[in-house]
């Protein structure tokens, strides 16, 4: 067999009949499978041992030769080779067909490749192939035309008239003869000539034919190979037959399909030998063609062949397609050994890098390691007795298990794994019970809670795998979230509450104003109840300074302990503050210190939230006294508006808007009163204020009023819910509430599926983007400024600058001082300095302009958000980007919000908008954009429709019709730039590409995607979105081929296009011209260089058909292709630069059985 790790690229093509015969180990002549009495395979049948190899290791069919010593002998009685049974997984057979048949992929696929190369319509092809009509092969000297179709009657008539002067035939033989006659070079020349001369439909047709002809020419495939004389039979182990309990057999559908082909083929052979009448033979040939079609792609033409219970049989194509197909089920995701799963519970005493593993689980997972250690320590004589000891769970086993698992990390995974933090490594600690314990702080990353969630454990076996788990995947290293570079392990709930309670100040508490000589003295006073935890006191520091603080804050700083470098935190510490402390600690002191700090916060937080003894009761929900007045005032104002409406002074729409804004104001006023009137130590208030649980909106609903609700369509009902949950709702109010709740649940269910599919498409389009070099040397970049929506800042300038490389020197506009030199990274301080200097735009290096082929360079990507340092070569930034965009997808709201009113403002939001942008679809409610830079000279109204006229600088006029009901964004006399929106709505990115070019559309997409996420309160770094947009703009469409070999109208990779032009220009030829195209992510994934990646994504058969005809070569550059063929992925430590390294492990002297133990331990 082929050595998997030893080839560079993979090629797909059409197989010639000779090649199929060369693969085969023998011809399958009979449809029998196994003998029903002996249950042994029948000779020459579909499971024949002579063809495919023995069913038992080292044993022939008749039993003359048994045992290894006869290896390689072919038995003289039964003809079976004595070898391993696993050759039945790789040896193929073949069926010699009595008549050629066409391959359904090439005749029925869209476009029909056979039809294009013969210049026949698929319909007429079908007539010939399925014996409905004759096709003229050689007209001789008759008035017939080559490839003309004749019905039965016409054929007879011409036969009578001209005798044998012409040749016509039907079926695949006829098509095969026509295909054999094609001279590809001559045909290509003719088509190129026709391209130059024709136009319109004919030109398009010629182009499509030329594409297929060129594919055949360049790949070395012959057109007649689309017709098959021989059919390969796949190895029997890949279409197994197994005996069930009841003595019946279950078999793969393929065996049924093959059996039909063999039966019909044998019948056809017999009929031909007998010299049966033409019509019978023809019918049999047609049935053979249909049987082969069903085998290759059942259901593609006509009704599918069904098995028992009317279920369509699974053909070879179905084996590859879809989620259950070979690609997605077995090649991209495999089941693994050395794994287990169990319910999770919290382990508050664990360190950041630990997890609790149940004893029985650990023993089973580490069994081989334990067995080897038992032998090494002399507690067992050989592996067999060690195995017995483990199975009987002897006492010594537990001590050995402790030794084995120390320093051996395990991986914990929680489904759904939405981003890379869904799998992390921990050091196991043995625990009693049967539940896995996990550290409370990693719950955020896993999105785990303890209401019955389960997690899976995996054991990395090899030394390399353990090293990677320890150095790259340890939970203590994953402090920052790759999507925005903020800490992902900040404390939540109880811990936040504890820290907040500890650092709050209470006015006039016991012992306020007292002074102490040291921390210890103050702490003793606190323990003896002389001072209250929240009282402001003065304490002398070690440096002699008097510090005014509370004992709680001293404890917070001392007990955690907060590192000296971060200073003393003398303030209320809520969730935001805690996150900030962690982020600063990580920046200044690195991973180890942060992990220690986190464990400290966890301990102190839990301890003091317990001491605080929080409870909430109905009395803690205080309804403000002036609620009645606020509501009464609003009601009377609403009544006035209703009167105005009834008098006809205002329209229904105005009334609706006014009522809604009145009630919203009332709710806001009430909320402000409510929050102001709450006691600072009210438990409900403390929970919300500290960020532990709940928020102002929820308190408002408990103690203020529920406010306005939306109906099922999303329109706000202008009748508010005036009650709150403390007072209780009336029946009507309750009914109105249910709309929103139901919609929320339905939305969530739909959103999860949509978001998962979006992530899958994003991963697919960006999976081959890896950091491949240090600097691509580009001189281009993008200009960044802050993103605004109306008067609200969506993304601040410094967020966009931090961690990127400056393209040119950035100087202070007034002093001229150099803030950042060109090609150096802008760190957080520099970004702040730039913003403070009042600089509004900065040019930075960006992924969008990176010149690296098949990836990006370190300088264009900038900082790796998960580590806060410059990105490493080999980082799979494409997949990280896809996960960062996809993971928050579930949080985005689904539907279009019809916020009452403003016509034309109905633009899609939330997840659907993100999808619309990444798929580059034409948006609903499209905005009109200016094609040129100029001034608006007139806005006129023609028959109820408005028209905008723009005059550009040269005096040329452009006019645009505004559809009825659209909102204008411009007025007469305004100056507009090319690409500016003239009306409200979303811009069609394809139009923008034409008007503003690549850079314009890139920045537009980036801004729009950011807008959706930011307005939902999700922060994603620009660079992740940039990676995706770059993938969408990789291709160009050739317009004029010049002297290159490129075909006009074809999509080519931008880098390939430049290469082709460079080659032509070097020899002084005319370069080709092309225009950039914007592809949606699905299209871009299918247009990738790798056919393996595209085929495993969607439309498997279409991708493979095209790839085979073109003889595509997969360079195996992406991650997916390499996973599919089982190689190491070319990222991280799998990059070629690390491949040459050999891992040396110090050898231990072992006896015979010791060596065997090593083999078992590595799972070989």
UniProtKB/Swiss-Prot annotation:
It holds the Pfam family RNA_pol_Rpb1_3. InterPro entries: DNA-dir_RpoC2_beta_pp, DNA-dir_RpoC_beta_prime, DNA-dir_RpoC_beta_prime_bact, RNA_pol_asu, RNA_pol_N, RNA_pol_Rpb1_1, RNA_pol_Rpb1_3, RNA_pol_Rpb1_3_sf. Zn(2+) 1 binds at residues 60, 62, 75, 78. GO terms for molecular function: DNA binding; DNA-directed RNA polymerase activity; magnesium ion binding; zinc ion binding. It catalyses: RNA(n) + a ribonucleoside 5'-triphosphate = RNA(n+1) + diphosphate. Its cofactor is Mg(2+); Zn(2+). GO terms for cellular component: DNA-directed RNA polymerase complex. Keywords: DNA-directed RNA polymerase, Magnesium, Metal-binding, Nucleotidyltransferase, Transcription, Transferase, Zinc. It comes from the Bacteria. Zn(2+) 2 binds at residues 776, 850, 857, 860. Binds 1 Mg(2+) ion per subunit. HAMAP family: RNApol_bact_RpoC. DNA-dependent RNA polymerase catalyzes the transcription of DNA into RNA using the four ribonucleoside triphosphates as substrates. This is DNA-directed RNA polymerase subunit beta'. It comes from Moorella thermoacetica (strain ATCC 39073 / JCM 9320). The gene is rpoC.
